[in-house]
Amino acid sequence: SIYVYIKRKNRVYSKNKIVVVEKEQLKNTEFVIVADDCWGAAVYQWYGRSYNSPFAGVGIYGDCFIKLLSDFDEYMKKELKFVTETKYPQRPLNYPMALLGDVELHFTHYKTKEDAGTKWERRTQRMLEVTDKDNYFFKMSDVWGASEENYEAFHKLPFKNKVSYIPKN
């Protein structure tokens, strides 16, 4: 119908106009998104920005994500070690997986460990150039099996910018 057509055109026009305004507002602002799933990559794409985070295209189970964030700076100094077995058997490993210390990182959007490792290193360096933690945004959802305890722990972390998406019962 013509109504649906107009509604779609308006949505595309509005989206493009909003993005232009938001891009202008963020022009000189570097920000880092640390998410437990691919959400951060979508935000960087929306704004046409380089990935300032190695977590783009990476999934992290709830317990591991809380462990990582609880000692974030120390974990980010660790080296990736690619492995072939996971402690979370819910999902078949048909993608590269690595340990960062004892935290599992699931590179679900990568074909090879070489590609995953190269992008991890490059994006980690880019992330570490953003030294003001007030420009870091942390996001958690239930996509990778976060529990209620994980959400509670997440919101007790000392980071300024946190958001979580919790499913309704």
Where are these regions (language model features)?
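Conserved binding-pocket/active-site segment within a compact domain
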Residues: R126-N169
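Positively charged, amphipathic N-terminal segments that serve as targeting/anchoring signals
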Residues: V19-T29, A35-M140
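Generic serine detector
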Residues: S1, S14, S50-S53, S70, ...
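Membrane-proximal basic amphipathic "stem/tether" segments
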Residues: S1-K27
